[in-house]
Amino acid sequence: MFIIGQRWISESENNLGLGIVTARDNRTVTIRFPAAEEERIYALAVAPLIRVQFQKGDRINCIDGWQLDVEDVLDNQGFVIYLGSRVDNGEQVALPEMQLDHKVSFSKPQDRLFSAQIDRSDRFALRYRALQHQQAQFQSPLRAMRGIRASLIPHQLHIAKEVGQRVAPRVLLADEVGLGKTIEAGMILQQQLFSGRVERVLVLVPESLQHQWLVEMLRRFNLNFSLFDEERCSDFDKTDEDGNDISENPFESEALVIASIDWLEKATTRATQVLLADWDLLIVDEAHHLVCSATESSQAYQFVARLAKKITAVLLLTATPEQLGLDSHFARLALLDPDRFYDYATFIAEQKAYKPVADAVANLLNDKPLNDMAKNAIAELLSEQDTEPMFKIINSEKSAESDRLQVRQELINALIDRHGTSRVLFRNTRQGVKGFPHRVYHQITLEMPDQYANALNVRAMMGSMEPQDHFYPERLYQCLNSQAPMGNRWEDFDPRIAWLMTFLKNHRDEKVLIICKQAEIAITLAQVLREREAIRTAVFHEHMTIVERDRAAAYFAQIEEGAQVLISSSIGSEGRNFQFARNLVLFNLPDNPDLLEQSIGRLDRIGQKNDIQIYVPCFKNSMQIVLAEWYHRGLNAFEETCPMGSNLFAEFSETLQSFFNDPQATGFEEFIAKTSKRRQQLKMELEQGRDRLLELNSNGGETAQALAEAIAQEDNNPHLVNFALNLFDIIGLEQEDLGEKLIALNPTGHMLVSDFPGLSEEGTTITFDRQLALMREEIELLTWDHPMIRHGIDLITSGDIGKCAISLLINKNLPAGTLLLEAIYVVEAQAPKSLNLTRFLPPTPVRVLLDSKGNDMASQVAFTSLEKQLKPVNKQMANKIAKMAQTQIKKLIMLSEQKIETKAQAIIIAAKQQADNVLSAELHRLTSLQAVNKNIRADEIELLEHLKAESLAQLTQANWRLDSLRVIVSNKA
């Protein structure tokens, strides 16, 4: 019966919103849909309409914008009035149904079922699987570590896991060059973000590394950082009509920020704004530039010190922690833990005291007997343990090798836990990490063209000569001869180009990376190689967008039809690694050792399978050859990493400059010998200062190896592949198998959502193969941690997709018309993300399968086997079933609520027990270690105590809700 003013919805056109009866006669009813500004006239006998009536406990929207919590429902001659209290002010009001908001949405599965918003059965299945996978991923110990687009390097994974799971980590990451500090920092950051402990992040880097960090964070971790500079910040500077400053703090506009510490040193207003903004995590790269001694500290150090006081989590990165002296090293440790590192003299004394322990550890590692000095050093550090029986086993020739191995490992583990800086400082060295190739240097000495010599003479006569002119004569010539005719341009006579083309023809089957100083040189070189020798060439420079660089990198990476050569400007290649190539040509020699190492580091990474061949073409009697000789014979910087390179560069810069001014001056050989001797001296000091105990703690050993293997086993996981493809199919993405383990995803016009996370308008190419993704940077590597999967799961579980469905069960053993109810409940704790309770109690789906008598058959009938027997029902038939069986379905829903309580309570109790066990064990370990290791911060223990108390309290309040349901009706065929 239709009454004017009643609210109805259309079964076939849910998108019209909530309709209102405006007229009726003996044969028809007229419904107006204000939200869609549409009107429909239906025949009374077959009107596809459903009456909308809310129930006690529902929250409904008024047309005026406020909400009402329904406490009672009155029926006034077929017209409904809702009684309850307003959400905004608590006022008790009556709301006639005519005043309901025209845009209605039903979120409860039972409401959707009875309002003709029934979904397909395969979407219900996808929703349940999404909930299952979400639960599994929240509890996975590999979460936030397997999604990185990088090789699985054990020591990196170990540091990331050890630090990333801490509450408010404050550490110094000091791995040597090429061992992946940026990756370690990114994985630590990823874990902190995933756990909810961190939301706002500030990364401070030298200006030259800004783009490298931006690219690394995006390409390796799918983290969209924003680069802040003066131009960006000035957009937030505002004044009102009276000239009063009403500027906003630009650093509050983004959550993930990268800024140059060099810029902030000069821009005091911006530095103040950084300090005024709230941050959860601070990352500082190249932290050895933070100089501090007993008498003075740099401006950069003071600025970072102020930030470190107010930001709870801090990561400092440096490849050379003691490069500028132990006092600066101590000062950086004091930034991290001022209570622990309060006195420099005490710190020095402690460092000396650990020397005998480090020597003892070396003996333990080499399975050598321990002398009295070593035993005394170990016994003093492990004073709470009786170590004598262990020493006897180690020193006795009669001891079984397995016993000695076990005791040695126990001692090493105990010493690591008590090591002076092992919780604050992590350092791996190339000696301690295997897998690096050799570097082979080839110096190509060429005659300087007369054109360059003349250009240099002209510049000298003009009195405006600069060192850059000697290092990059092609730029000088181009500047002086900008209108040079064809055949007389620099690329027409430079002998480096002739050598390069011959070299490339002789190495046709090998990839070659060429690094130039400037983008213009790279572009010109590429054009010459293409036009003269048809050499397939890609270009990489700072004026290209990230997408353009991706395409160039992909072209270079292709094996069959890819580019033989990638020509890059020195800035353009920052953050990009090309381990699949082994030939490096430095067309322009970098003008300082750090830049040289950065260039070689594009190929010299963990994962490089071949020896790296480094070619440097340079001119006789030039600055270039002086610098090349000094790099090679003085620093040995081409064939070995030179961590002391910048120190030596600063120490010998004046003498080096004198030879730049006169490359043929006498005494150069003595200068080379002096540099080499000093390098050997510094290298020996570094080697003697190696802390094997620290390296052991940083390396992770067998545990780290097992972690890498566990992640490798998850790569190409069939559950992930099947779920992802099913997700993309149901969402409505077009999928094209490209072969070679590649799938192209493209948006379509019939997608369930207009904007799928991670999918660009042009489409996205994906793979589940890590090695392929490492070679092809334009391809997305899909893992459980990838945004397309994580946000795809969120899209399904937090929306209405698959919330209710109706299916036919083809089973000859059941009477036709038998009704079953499959209800999916979710047990969860509504708590602050920072508690990271999802590791103990993630949103957990619990399945209840009731027969018509109310018996729960979930344990007897598996979801997958039932799914195979189900057939879809068209929408019209589904609506009829929902109407006809409404009373029975409601009864079964009430029964399911009784069944779920016992199951849910058991899950909550188990989660509380797990949380108590894990947090108590962690607390006990830290408390015990604090007695013997001063590096355990008191605030770290206090935070953990608070975390435990709050976690258990929140888990006590955990609850459950009906997430989705499926009505199943049996049929014979």
From Swiss-Prot:
| Family as reported in the entry's similarity comment | Belongs to the SNF2/RAD54 helicase family. RapA subfamily.
Task: List its EC numbers.
Answer: 3.6.4.-
Q: What does this protein do?
A: Transcription regulator that activates transcription by stimulating RNA polymerase (RNAP) recycling in case of stress conditions such as supercoiled DNA or high salt concentrations. Probably acts by releasing the RNAP, when it is trapped or immobilized on tightly supercoiled DNA. Does not activate transcription on linear DNA. Probably not involved in DNA repair.
The organism is Haemophilus ducreyi (strain 35000HP / ATCC 700724)
Residues covered by the Helicase C-terminal domain: 496-672
* UniProt enzyme class: hydrolase
GO MF annotations, alphabetized = ATP binding; DNA binding; helicase activity; hydrolase activity, acting on acid anhydrides
A Pfam family matched by this chain, by name?
Answer: SNF2-rel_dom
Please tell me where ATP binds in this chain: 175-182
Motif (DEAH box) on chain: 285-288
- What keywords is this UniProt entry annotated with? Activator, ATP-binding, DNA-binding, Helicase, Hydrolase, Nucleotide-binding, Transcription, Transcription regulation
Share an example GO biological-process annotation for this protein: regulation of DNA-templated transcription
Task: Show the HAMAP family listed in the entry.
Answer: Helicase_RapA
**Domain Helicase ATP-binding intervals:** 162-339
Relate the assembly described in the record.
Interacts with the RNAP. Has a higher affinity for the core RNAP than for the holoenzyme. Its ATPase activity is stimulated by binding to RNAP.
Q: What is this protein called?
A: RNA polymerase-associated protein RapA
